[in-house]
Amino acid sequence: MAAAKTEMLLPALQISDPLSFPHSPTDNYPKLEEMIMLNSAGTPFLNATAPEGAVFGSGEPGEQFDHLAGDTLSEISMEKPLSDQTYSTQRLPPISYTGRFTLEPATNCSNSLWAEPLFSLVSGLVGINPPPASIPSSTSQATHPSSSSTSSIPSSSSSSTSSASLSCSVHQSEPNPIYSAAPTYSSASPDIFPESGPNFSTTVGTSLQYSSSTYPSAKTCNPSFSVPMIPDYLFTQQQSEISLVPPDQKPIQTQAGQQPALTPLHTIKAFATQTGSQDLKSVYQSQLIKPSRMRKYPNRPSKTPPHERPYACPVETCDRRFSRSDELTRHIRIHTGQKPFQCRICMRNFSRSDHLTTHIRTHTGEKPFACEICGRKFARSDERKRHTKIHMRQKDKKAEKGATAAVQSSVSNISISASSPVSSYPSPITSYPSPVSSFPSPVNSCYSSPVHTSYPSPSIATTYPSATSTFQTQVATSFPTSVASNIYSSPVTTPLPDMQSALSPRTADIC
C-alpha cells in the first residue's frame, strides 16, 4: 500500500520510472522518510495537496473509519461516486482519471489473488484510505488508517508529525496521474509491517496511545473466499492452488485421469464432406482419440468387398467402411451422439430421418404396411416382415403335418394289402388232399349215404362260399368230386370198427 501511495505524488518526489511494477518494499522507504521530513519542516506543498480535514473530519483520528470496523470487503463498491463521501470541510474538485490500470495476480499468495490490488485501486478512485491488508490473509481488515501504518515503520516511527498529508489524494497541478496497484506479498517480517502501531500521530503533532485490542486481529482467510467481481474462469489454477477452490466448485483435473473428449461436430462434418483430402484426414484422425464401442460381430466379413467401400470411418479404433458418403455421415453420428432430427410433437431427437418418420406414425396412428395373408396393418416395414415370418412358420408346420398324414395313410394301405385274410387260406386247403385221397374207398363205401343224409351238401356249401368261389379252379383240379364230403368224411372213418358198429344203429334210427 505504501508503495502505491508514494507513487501518487509524482511531482513532489520525482519518482523515476513510475510505471515500473512491481516494486520492492525497501525501494520506497527513503522516499517515505523524505516525505515525512518535508512534512515536519512545514513544506507548503504537502500541506496543499490535501487539507487536514480531508482525512480526519473533526480532528478525531479514526472517526472516518468507524464504519470500516470488521470485515469491510462487501461494503466498498467500485461504483461509489465522489459526491457520496462526507467531508466536514472542503471537498476535492472533480478530477478526470486517465491511464492504464494493470492488475496482475500474485501467484505466491496463499489465499486470494485479486483482493489487495483491487481495493488499492478502489481507494485511489474513491478517495478513502483503505485499511491495510493483513499479511497472512488477503481479506481487508479495518485495523488503523494507512497513514499511521506508514508512519509506524521503524525508520520513521520516532517522528510525531502529522501524516494526514500522506493520504490517497491527488496534487492539483497534475491533472492526469497514473496509478499502479501495489504488489501483494504472501509473507512479511514483523519489522517491516508490524501488526499494530502503538503510536498514532494527530494533526497537531501530539501522540495518543491506542491499545491493540481496540481493533480486531487479523483473522485467517476462509478457503472459500472469492472476489465476486472477478469470475473464476479468468485465471488458470495450478496444482498447488487447488485448495483455493470453493467446495462447491470442482477443481480442474489433468487430462491423464479424464476420458478423452469427443471430436467437435464441425470437424466431423468437414471430414464427412471432404473425405478425399488426405491432409484433412490426418488432422482429424489425430483428434479422434475416443475409443469406439466394440462391434457385435467383429470377425464377420462384409458382403461388399473393401475396394467398393471407399468411405472409411475416421475413428482410429473403428474399422467400418461404407460405399456411400451419407452412410458414413449417419455412422459418424453414433460416435458423436448427434441427433439433428427432432419430433415437433414430443420434442424427441433422433439421429436418422427414417427413425423420425416411423416415430411420427406413433402419434398419427398411420399404418401403411399391411400383411398380405391376414391383412393386419403395421407402422413399420420390419414389423410386417417379422409378422410374415409367423405365417411362413405356420405354413411350414401345416405342410409337415400333411406330409406325415399322407405317409401314414400309404403305409397303412400297404400293410392291409400285404396281410389280407384271403391269402392265408390256401395253405390249409392244399394240405388236405393227401389224407383225403389216402382213404377214398372206405369213405365212399361205408358212409356214403349217412353223411349225405345227416349233413346235406347245400348247408355245407353255404358255409364257405367265398373259399369255394375264390379257389374254384384249384379245388376243381384237385378234387373234381364233392369237396365237402371229402373234408368231413375223414373224421368219421378214423374211429375203430367197434365204434362203427355202435354208430350204425343210430344212423338207422335217424333214417
UniProtKB/Swiss-Prot annotation:
Identify the tissues in which this protein is expressed. Detected in muscle and brain.
Stored InterPro entries: EGR1_C, EGR_N, Znf_C2H2_sf, Znf_C2H2_type
Instruction: Summarize what gene deletion causes.
Output: Knockouts show subtle abnormalities in the inner plexiform layer, outer plexiform layer and Muller Glia cell tiling.
Gene name, Swiss-Prot/TrEMBL: egr1
**Single annotated GO MF:** zinc ion binding
For this UniProt record, the keywords arranged alphabetically read as follows: Activator, Biological rhythms, Cytoplasm, DNA-binding, Metal-binding, Nucleus, Repeat, Transcription, Transcription regulation, Zinc, Zinc-finger
Concerning SUPFAM superfamilies, the annotation shows: beta-beta-alpha zinc fingers
Gene Ontology biological process? camera-type eye development; circadian regulation of gene expression; embryonic retina morphogenesis in camera-type eye; embryonic viscerocranium morphogenesis; positive regulation of DNA-templated transcription; positive regulation of transcription by RNA polymerase II; regulation of transcription by RNA polymerase II; retina layer formation
Q: Where is this site: Interaction with DNA?
A: 309, 320, 324, 330, 348, 352, 376, 380, 386
Protein's UniProt name: Early growth response protein 1
GO CC terms in record: cytoplasm; nucleus
Q: Where is this region: Disordered?
A: 133-169, 291-312, 384-406
> What family does the database annotate?
Belongs to the EGR C2H2-type zinc-finger protein family.
Basic residues bias spans: 386-396
Q: What does this protein do?
A: Transcriptional regulator. Recognizes and binds to the DNA sequence 5'-GCG(T/G)GGGCG-3'(EGR-site) in the promoter region of target genes. Binds double-stranded target DNA, irrespective of the cytosine methylation status. Regulates the transcription of numerous target genes, and thereby plays an important role in regulating the response to growth factors, DNA damage, and ischemia. Plays a role in the regulation of cell survival, proliferation and cell death. Mediates responses to ischemia and hypoxia; regulates the expression of proteins that are involved in inflammatory processes.
- Domain text from the record? Binds to DNA motifs with the sequence 5'-GCG(T/G)GGGCG-3' via its C2H2-type zinc fingers. The first, most N-terminal zinc finger binds to the 3'-GCG motif, the middle zinc finger interacts with the central TGG motif, and the C-terminal zinc finger binds to the 5'-GCG motif. Binds double-stranded target DNA, irrespective of the cytosine methylation status. Has reduced affinity for target DNA where the cytosines have been oxidized to 5-hydroxymethylcytosine. Does not bind target DNA where the cytosines have been oxidized to 5-formylcytosine or 5-carboxylcytosine.
Q: Where is the composition biased (Low complexity)?
A: 137-169
Q: Where are the zinc fingers (C2H2-type)?
A: 311-335, 341-363, 369-391
Localisation per UniProt entry: Nucleus; Cytoplasm
PROSITE patterns attached here? ZINC_FINGER_C2H2_1, ZINC_FINGER_C2H2_2
Q: Give the main location.
A: nucleus
Q: Name the source's superkingdom.
A: Eukaryota
